[in-house]
């Protein structure tokens, strides 16, 4: 059904270390499937309704489907002044004991950031694909936050590591956390996550 819609394109973006495939769904909506050229990991970009992509001086640009406006991609800390909505969904893991039931209780994502990102975690079990329902909350960070901490009193840091434990619950053989949130005016990089569980009997 999408084959007749204008906007199908692939492009290699060396500066971002990924290749991008633009998939138009309608004349106004598009998604991008992206593969990391170093690790081979895949992800999906949504909310970028793009008609075409191009490189200029190594930077990535796109033409929007609504009105022919050209934007510079992969830059800044907001989506044209709006929040950037993001979602992380790692691969399912048996956590070293395939065939055993587990009771999952806590999850801790590791972010490198210069702010305090609000996020929520929903747990997917045994290859399920649930819609996230938890409300994002902001963790407590030890470093000073711009426009919040007092000048000359806060300990300033270019980037800090957010390692807040979040309560989750589920019983299953394998699991994958869906971590989602929205950010504006801060940088954010996800590096890993930890999980706490109790191992039960084999099934």
Label each residue range with its predicted role:
Residues 1-203:
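Beta-sheet repeat architectures centered on beta-propellers
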């Amino acid at each position: 059904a999408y084959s007749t819609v204008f906007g199908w394109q692939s492009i290699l973006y060396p500066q971002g270390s990924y290749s991008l495939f633009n998939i138009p769904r309608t004349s106004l909506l598009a998604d991008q499937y992206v593969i990391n050229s170093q690790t081979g990991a895949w992800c999906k970009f949504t909310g970028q309704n793009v008609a075409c992509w191009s490189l200029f001086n190594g930077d990535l640009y796109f033409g929007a489907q609504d009105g022919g406006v050209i934007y510079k991609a992969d830059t800044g800390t907001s989506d044209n002044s709006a929040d950037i909505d993001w979602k992380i969904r790692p691969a399912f893991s048996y956590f070293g004991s395939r065939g055993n039931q587990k009771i999952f209780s806590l999850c801790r994502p590791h972010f490198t950031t210069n702010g305090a990102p609000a996020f929520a975690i929903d747990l997917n079990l045994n290859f399920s694909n649930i819609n996230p329902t938890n409300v994002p909350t902001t963790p407590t960070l030890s470093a000073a936050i711009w426009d919040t901490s007092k000048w000359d009193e806060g300990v300033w840091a270019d980037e800090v590591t957010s390692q807040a434990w979040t309560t989750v619950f589920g019983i299953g053989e394998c699991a994958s956390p869906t971590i989602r949130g929205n950010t504006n005016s801060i940088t954010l990089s996800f590096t890993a996550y930890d999980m706490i569980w109790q191992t039960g009997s084999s099934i």
